[in-house]
Swiss-Prot record:
Recorded superkingdom: Bacteria
Function (record text): Bifunctional serine/threonine kinase and phosphorylase involved in the regulation of the phosphoenolpyruvate synthase (PEPS) by catalyzing its phosphorylation/dephosphorylation.
Keyword terms of this UniProt record: Kinase, Nucleotide-binding, Serine/threonine-protein kinase, Transferase
InterPro entries: Kinase-pyrophosphorylase, PSRP
Protein name: Putative phosphoenolpyruvate synthase regulatory protein
Binding site for ADP: G150, V151, S152, R153, C154, G155, K156, T157
Presence of the UniProt keyword Isomerase in the record: no
Gene Ontology MF: a single term: ATP binding
Keyword Kinase among UniProt keywords: yes
Catalytic activity: [pyruvate, water dikinase] + ADP = [pyruvate, water dikinase]-phosphate + AMP + H(+); [pyruvate, water dikinase]-phosphate + phosphate + H(+) = [pyruvate, water dikinase] + diphosphate
EC number: 2.7.11.33, 2.7.4.28
Family: Belongs to the pyruvate, phosphate/water dikinase regulatory protein family. PSRP subfamily.
Amino acid sequence: MAPKVFYISDGTAITAEVFGHAVLSQFPLEFESLTIPFVETLTKAEQVKRQINDCFITTGERPLVFHSIVKAEIRDIIYSSEGLDYDFLNTFVAPLEQHLGVSASPVLHRTHGKANHGYEARIDAINFAMDNDDGQTMKHMDQADLVLLGVSRCGKTPSSLYLSMQFGIKAANYPFTEDDMDNLKLPDALKRNKKKLFGLTIDPVRLHEIRQSRMENSRYSSLKQCRLEVKEVEMLFKRERIPYIDTTNHSVEEIATKILDVTGLERHMF
């Protein structure tokens, strides 16, 4: 039976999920998880406590409880459950108070709330990524922080969206298609913004597998075409001295982190 995990917060539960996932990913196990956000009242906290206790009674195993709860009275109710408790905020707040010599002044939803000064910047970045996805337009390249280049289905769109959502980076992306291969070159709008360009490549066999699931047995998905496109685009990257990375078997989080590391782009944390 898969171990049971609860992610609980009086906010969005994003922090609890990220922390919990990071810890549990160290173990070669499958976990069955439940996320419960916005536990903002004592009544809701008691309901969650009963869920945790019922899980313990049913399975005979204490469920893992990762939480980031600001309100002490709600946190105390979760503490009193039969779950194995991992309190992200309290673990770090007390030592930081001692080190900084300042008492914490918890404000609910401060990290992810709309009142945060970076909210508008993040929304602008997300809109920019969607408006400038897959070479839809070249009019806004001058406004981009980053322009991702690569063959179709190499990870450009998810990487652009992740960078915009997580770090407020205005990331456009531009695809090189089958029609470009005979005379592969940078469009003028990209040449003008060459310092913003970053390439993504991928193993041709993996690209073939991805494209097969989209357009099976087509020229677009053939291994021969995939090899040709990857070879030509990598040659362009080298010729134009555009930095690039291989996305094969890497998660979007890993790809984004590598891009930031190579480019030195500033992360805007929200």
